[in-house]
Regions:
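Bacterial N-terminal signal peptides that target proteins for export
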Residues: 1-13
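Bacterial N-terminal signal peptides
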Residues: 12-21
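Short loop/turn motifs that connect adjacent beta-strands in outer-membrane beta-barrel proteins
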Residues: 27-34, 60-67, 93-97, 121-127, ...
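Gram-negative/organellar outer-membrane beta-barrel architecture
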Residues: 30-37, 42-214, 314, 381-382, ...
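Membrane-embedded beta-strand positions of outer-membrane beta-barrel proteins
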Residues: 37-39, 70-74, 100-102, 128-132, ...
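C-terminal outer-membrane beta-barrel translocator/porin domains of Gram-negative envelope proteins
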Residues: 72, 201-211, 215-341
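Short glycine-rich beta-strand segments
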Residues: 133-137, 242-248, 284-286, 345-352
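C-terminal hydrophobic structural anchor segments
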Residues: 326-365
Length: 403
């Protein structure tokens, strides 16, 4: 799990257990504040084992709509020791959302993450999104480039990163948006927190491993979306395509490279919408020389090939497919707000490759699995997914659906 999704994952676990723990509570409505101390126990293929306490505090408005989640937590991690964090999520009408995460661990790790999104800015004519973060992720992994990397090549590093980006979109009509944006990314690799070999030593000649990398990117995006909700949809289709030109400021020989992606998601609900089949296809391509490894396409993690750890396979290009059946189990009340609980068996497959000439059916990896979700519509989705692969199993927790 990468540094910014790790903390969100603990919140997600808490939300899922929240849904499970209040099924027997009587319903009530109206504005209010409630808190739920919950044991936080989780495991991750890259991040180790966690045990501690998280206290989600939920605030609702007079209509029972969720407005805030404040979630302080204290966790002991098997790799980085004690970790304290404050997580704040604010939800407003029209899909506006603000997230702030601040965290520090006993060993190496530090995180500050802020994001704001408004999908209906200026009375719905535009969309606006910006975010900034600084973090040190001490459990990052690198196995080398390509589809054929071995578990025996696993290495560890601390990713010291600063990121900032903005995106401004124009709604051409009710279902079509065109947006432009820019991003800045600063990355340097430092000694990791595990006993694995240091990436800087084991892969010293791979682009992006040595020294500091500064990336400045410009992106144009086309987005077609007929889904009935951006965060917790039950019907519709979404197509996203982007082209991005980047400059690697520290690279004087080959500073410019480009990235492209086309992603298609389609939901097939049953008549009652108690079961929803979701199909996703994703194609990514990177063009250029000496592209840093962390800027290339990757498989593994909480959003694709969920039976492997984050960034298990990395190369210039990627093809991925996923299918998931979201099955409604129960509906209950949390702090006067309606919450749903569902399970989701899934199958992920895909491959990375250096050239499209290298694509071969035998190189597709497959990871079956099952997920559990707690949903406070329309803004909050907490999930825990387990995927199985030839290298064992992996557990991922996060906010929002994987696709």
């Amino acid at each position: 799990m990468d540094s910014m999704t790790a903390l969100r994952g603990r919140i997600a676990v808490a939300l899922v257990f929240l849904v499970m723990s209040v099924i027997a509570r009587p319903e009530h409505a109206g504005a209010g504040v409630e808190y739920f101390p919950i044991p936080a126990v989780s495991t991750s293929k890259n991040d180790g084992n966690d045990a501690g306490l998280i206290v989600p505090i939920l605030k609702t408005d007079p209509d029972g709509e969720l407005k805030y989640i404040l979630a302080p937590m204290l966790i002991h991690n098997s790799i980085v020791g004690m970790r304290g964090a404050i997580n704040l999520f604010r939800y407003e009408p029209g899909g506006r959302e603000m997230r702030l995460i601040v965290s520090a661990a006993e060993k190496i790790e530090r995180k500050v993450v802020f994001s704001y999104t408004d999908p209906a800015f200026s009375q719905g004519r535009y969309s606006l999104n910006f975010s900034a973060s600084f973090f040190k992720n001490a459990t990052a992994r690198f196995f080398g480039l390509g589809e054929g990397t071995s578990v025996s090549e696993e290495s560890n590093y601390t990713a010291r990163e600063g990121r900032a980006n903005w995106r401004f979109g124009v709604h051409v009509n009710e279902v079509t948006q065109i947006s432009v944006g820019q991003r800045f990314r600063q990355v340097s690799l430092q000694q990791g927190a595990t006993d694995l070999p240091f990436t800087g030593t084991q892969f010293s000649t791979v682009d992006g491993v040595q020294g500091e990398t500064l990336i400045f990117g410009n992106r144009a995006t086309f987005h077609y979306d007929t889904r009935n909700n951006l965060v917790s949809p039950t019907d519709g289709m979404a197509v996203t395509a982007y082209a991005e030109v980047n400059q690697n400021i520290r690279n004087g020989d080959h500073p410019v490279y480009s990235r492209y992606e086309v992603e298609v998601k389609k939901l097939f609900p049953s008549e009652s919408k108690r079961a929803i089949l979701i199909v996703r296809a994703d194609l990514q391509a990177t063009i250029g020389d000496q592209v840093p490894f962390f800027e290339q396409s990757s498989l593994g993690g909480q959003n694709n090939l969920r039976g492997y750890g984050v960034d298990r396979f990395i190369d210039k290009n990627l093809i991925a497919w996923s299918i998931e059946e979201r099955i409604h189990l129960v509906r209950t009340k949390i702090a006067g707000t309606t919450a749903d609980f569902e399970m989701a068996p899934f199958l992920d497959t895909g491959q990375v490759f250096n050239s499209f000439n290298d694509v071969a059916f035998k190189d597709y990896r497959m990871t079956p699995g099952i997920g559990f979700r707690g949903i406070v519509r329309p803004n909050v989705v907490g999930r825990v997914d387990y995927g199985y692969s030839r290298e064992g199993g992996a557990v991922f927790a996060g906010l929002d659906f994987p696709y």
